[in-house]
Design a protein with these regions (language model features):
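Short, conserved catalytic or interaction motifs in soluble domains
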Residues: 22
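C-terminal motif of bacterial Sec signal peptides marking the signal peptidase cleavage site
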Residues: 17-19
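A structural "domain/chain start" motif
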Residues: 25-136, 140-153, 157-193, 197-268, ...
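Bacterial N-terminal signal peptides that target proteins for export
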Residues: 1-10
Length: 361
């Protein structure tokens, strides 16, 4: 099972849907595809309308984000905090495909192949909204740090230590991971940096899912180390990843080959969310570097979108396949409320890390 969050509108175009279309919505709108021995179906679940979702209260409680490790107290204690880079990654496509072959009833001398796939994309969010959330998230972290009594570097100070850091052109990059040719899941996303804390190459999740990930991480660690050396404080480079859908796929080939793929709209803080930190340990030469990783995906139970889906079956008893295309149509005001709940919870978890190392903070 894969869980994720993302916007096709980021790429400036909604998902194109063909065939017979049914529009549905609700707390968990679902699109599924199933291929069995001799039939295939595509379905979409129902629930709340866009009007009902838009009428929900504007604020949402911060999501309970947690990390799987902690910043060492020797690095976090009694240091000025610098946040030279802050990124938000928006998942905008999630696809799943199941392939199953054979089975005792699969045919004479070789069996048959069944496949089911679901392709999803997030729509309904204006491009400028994504940038606004990134800017808000960065400002919120600084505000939470100051409210906790932690000294925070000014924008000028943070910019000065990052003057030689390799910035990402356009303060944005696109990424993808996974594949579905032989079954499995794939994810696409776009990462934007806060305008006051632009993305630094190697600290922004580029290369994730590919062979360049290791090289990007090496460059990012070197950049973080240089910034920490220059600052004399604690450098933080947060990366928040937001998802919009859960996708899953499964297949079996016991009696008859079957394949299933499903997508359910759900907002969440997704894996890939992390904080790179660096600071010089007392008595040591170069600065130490580490990463806080998200302990687990953090979903919200609140509805934020409807779903439009189309699909059907194709093939015959020796090779049946189904495919569903689904657009998760976000209600922007509700999505924004959940995005704010996500960054507030993420930032609160960062602040808690520092407070734990500073008993008086």
């Amino acid at each position: 099972m894969a869980r994720a969050t993302t916007p096709i509108i980021l790429l400036a175009a909604p998902l194109l849907l063909g065939g017979c279309m049914a529009t549905t919505g609700g707390p968990a709108p679902t699109a599924g595809a199933q291929a069995g021995f001799a039939s295939g179906v595509a379905t979409a679940g129902g629930g709340l309308s866009a009007t009902q979702i838009a009428a929900m209260p504007g604020e949402a409680a911060p999501l309970p984000v947690g990390f799987s490790s902690a910043i060492p107290a020797s690095l976090a204690a009694a240091r000025k905090v610098f946040v030279p880079a802050y990124g938000v990654s928006y998942i905008h496509t999630q696809n799943a495909r199941a392939v199953s072959q054979g089975g005792l009833m699969g045919g004479f001398g070789g069996g048959s192949t069944r496949s089911a796939s679901v392709r999803t994309g997030l729509t309904g969010i204006a491009p400028e909204t994504f940038q606004r959330i990134a800017d808000e998230a960065h400002a919120d972290l600084l505000a939470q740090l100051r409210a906790a009594g932690i000294e925070v570097a000014t924008a000028e100070e943070a910019g000065a230590i990052a003057a030689s850091a390799p910035r990402i052109a356009g303060n944005a990059h696109d990424g993808s991971a996974g594949g579905t040719m032989l079954g499995g899941q794939s994810t696409g996303w776009r990462t934007l940096g806060a305008q006051a804390a632009p993305l630094v190459s190697g600290l922004s999740g580029e290369g994730a899912g590919g062979g360049l990930a290791g090289l990007a991480a090496i460059g990012g660690n070197q950049a973080a180390q240089r910034m920490a050396d220059a600052s004399g404080g604690l450098v933080l480079a947060p990366l928040l990843r937001l998802d919009y859908v859960n996708v899953s796929s499964s297949g079996r080939s016991l009696l008859a080959a079957t394949a299933n793929a499903e997508a359910t709209a759900q907002f969440s803080v997704a894996p890939g969310t992390a904080v790179t930190y660096a600071a010089r340990r007392q008595g040591m030469g170069a600065s130490d570097i580490g990463t806080l990783q998200l302990a687990a995906s953090v979903p919200s139970a609140e509805p934020f979108a409807t779903m439009a889906a189309s699909g059907g079956a194709a093939g015959n008893w020796v090779g049946l396949g189904t495919r569903t295309d689904a657009a998760v149509q976000a209600v922007e005001a509700r999505w924004v409320a959940l995005a704010r709940a996500a960054y507030r919870g993420f930032n609160a978890a960062i602040v808690q890390q520092l407070r734990a190392a500073r008993p008086t903070a």
